[in-house]
Amino acid sequence: SVCDLPESLIREFGISICPYYVCTDHGRFRDGEELRTDELLLHMAEGQTDYSQPPDVEDYERFFAEKLTEAQNVLHITMAKHVSQGYYNALEAAKSFENVTVLDSGHLSSSMGLMVLCASYMAERHFSKGEIVKNMKRLRRHISSAFIIDNTEMMCQAGKISRRVQIFCDALLLHPVIVLRKSRMVVGSMRTGDFAHMAKSYTKRVFLDSRNIDRRILFITYAGMDDQRLQYIRDLVQQYCPFERIYMQKASSAIASNCGPGSFGLLFMKKNEIVLNLSQASRPEETD
């Protein structure tokens, strides 16, 4: 559920999802099935404690067993292994099966989703499991995964950044840019100012090396933003680095519980040799 892909693409490629959990003061809920992002953000606005939790080993065992009734082999792509326990739980569950392979995406959210899309496309074209894994490990280095955080309180509560970093950011009105490097979440840089200023600064920096960017697909993945802010981000993208397809993707509740409202990421691939063709049916509407 944390790959943050639109339903149109999930349907097109027949992608199977093993949902994360979101734990609140009212219990534990399956991400996207029992708790939606908007509902979670209302909980957070009321000051309630929320955090994400990966599927248990038993959840993965049931998931893999079900999928193996439909296919001879299963390739499961997980969130970055140093960000979530999900990779290790899936790896443990895979020991019960001979034909389940678990792959660390090295990313999260729609950046991980890009790897899922490419792997699914290759599977549809009858690439072997070994070929897909080899290509995905290569692709991992060609994905740009960076989010800018509006308020660091949620990330601190989730243990993703230290209390010292949070205090520093609050005192100086700084917005950290969180990047994924070697499957680890690190603070790549800081942006200052109000939303308009920090969004423009972040966007300009992300697209600095535009000649090396694969412009086929961009995900603008966000949590708790109104239409005006989303349109402002789209306009910035058009100004600095237009893409063939731009998906405005609401982050899953599991992702939103970590980054908090007002955060967003510009997630895309750098130029690479992976072939990926999408149908017109899954093309995002221009007004999305």
Where are the regions a protein language model picked out?
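N-terminal glycine-rich anion-binding loop in soluble enzyme alpha/beta folds
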Residues: 1-54
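Mixed-charge interfacial surface used for oligomerization/domain docking
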Residues: 2-24, 73, 83-101, 107-288
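Glycine-rich, highly charged phosphate/nucleotide-binding loops
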Residues: 53-62
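Short, well-structured alpha-helical segments in soluble
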Residues: 62-69
